[in-house]
Amino acid sequence: MPYIATKHLNIYFEEKGDDAPVLFISGTGGDLRQRPNVLDGPLPKHHRVIAYDQRGLGRTEKPDRPYTMDEYGNDAAELLAALGIEQVDVIGVSFGGMVAQHFAIRHPSMVRKLVLCCTSPGGDMPSYPFHLIPEDLTPKERFLTLVGISDTRRDQEWQAEHPQQLRR
């Protein structure tokens, strides 16, 4: 399995394709074990796509403490440095877009282009402790857990009042 040992943790990553490098930073709950993912789409036909499990998710290390947005951004920089990539196009989706912004602010010389999808500015607060989500959840249980975390329109109160909406 492809791991990179950075200064702070072991990061699981996968890459596919050739040509100009693109760093793909996934959203809440992103895990490269989920298929299909960005590596199965058309992007690797035109780029060298690097995707990784962020700290606390998938097969990347899960330090047992809150994570800062600066750490997430630095993880991306350390991964690229370990791969010998000096400059990259970055695609950040949802929470990954927040991470991409922190990466771009902290490491501007590494970013050639920045594409932000379905995201917000985020902030400097620690992220949700994704490493505390059990790995053995059923797909439905995982969905319900992630909805409560990522969709502020559907918090626990809303879920309790609209159980029929969640059964779809």
Regions found by a protein language model. Name each.
Residues 142-168:
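Conserved alpha/beta-hydrolase catalytic His-Asp/Glu region
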Residues 41, 45, 78, 105-109:
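Short, well-ordered alpha-helices that flank and scaffold nucleotide-derived cofactor binding pockets
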Residues 21, 48, 86-89, 110-113:
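Structural signature of beta-strand start/N-cap positions in the alpha/beta core
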Residues 101-106, 111-142:
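Flexible "cap/lid" loop of the alpha/beta hydrolase fold
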Residues 6-61, 65:
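Conserved HGGG/HGGXW glycine-rich cap/lid loop of the alpha/beta-hydrolase fold
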Residues 50-92:
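Active-site loop/oxyanion-hole signature of alpha/beta-hydrolase fold enzymes
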Residues 92, 96, 100:
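Gly/Ala-rich beta-loop-alpha elbow adjacent to hydrolase catalytic centers
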Residues 28-29, 94, 120-121:
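Short, flexible active-site-adjacent loop segments at beta-strand->alpha-helix junctions, enriched
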